[in-house]
Amino acid sequence: MLIKSIGMYLIGILILFIALYPRHSFAFEPNIDFNAPDWVEERESADNDIPELPRAGSLFGSGDKPLFSDRRAMKPDDLITIVISENANANFTTNKNYNGASGGNVTPPSIEYTGNNEEQKQIVSELNDQAAYNLTKANNTSNFQGGGAQTRSEALNATITARIVKVLDNNTYFIHGRREVLVDGEKQILELSGVVRSFDISKDNVVQSKHIANAKIAYTSLGPISDTNHKKPVSDGIESLYPF
């Protein structure tokens, strides 16, 4: 009865510890920082204050809808469309073999007396008898063989509209975009940030994700369906603390 009470007490303490302990302490939770990289923060912003010259008698000014030029994102808070097409394939194989063997004998040296003194001969003979031992090392053989293989294939295809956060002095833009879609209580979140060149923006104001430097893309889902793909905190904690 006492052992049962102690066991229940320890189980209760373990459950309480797991419930109160932060979940991220047991398992690694992937996270992405979408803030601008340090080199973007350190770089000077470009001067976008371009004065508009008066055009006396002209029917077409340099407004937001120019007649003979493409309307592309050029300044902070302009919007730009990002076409995300990311494919990742990985194949990894490893094999390791190890064979080792050891053993041997050690024989001590003997003393030889070439004189005629019988007493000395007797002493040398006794010394040789006392040292007449062979040191033998036990034979040892070890073998190890291991290997592993991993194959992964992932794809993400989506479209998102991002905002220019900062225009750098080298004609590149730091962008950030976020989109949330709620369907039947399941929230899907797509977030992106990175640096694009003005030359990579098409005439339709579109950039492919492969042209984004320091690209950070996250696609997550929150809701009852996605919760079934994650372990519960108690199960996760017990597995993390299990020593075997």
Curated annotation (Swiss-Prot):
Keywords: Bacterial flagellum, Cell outer membrane, Membrane, Signal. One of its GO terms (molecular function) is cytoskeletal motor activity. It is found in: Cell outer membrane; Bacterial flagellum basal body. Its main location: membrane. Residues 1-27 form the signal peptide. GO terms for biological process: bacterial-type flagellum-dependent cell motility. GO terms for cellular component: bacterial-type flagellum basal body, distal rod, L ring; cell outer membrane. It comes from the Bacteria. PANTHER family: FLAGELLAR L-RING PROTEIN. Assembles around the rod to form the L-ring and probably protects the motor/basal body from shearing forces during rotation. The basal body constitutes a major portion of the flagellar organelle and consists of four rings (L,P,S, and M) mounted on a central rod. Belongs to the FlgH family. This is Flagellar L-ring protein. It comes from Helicobacter hepaticus (strain ATCC 51449 / 3B1).
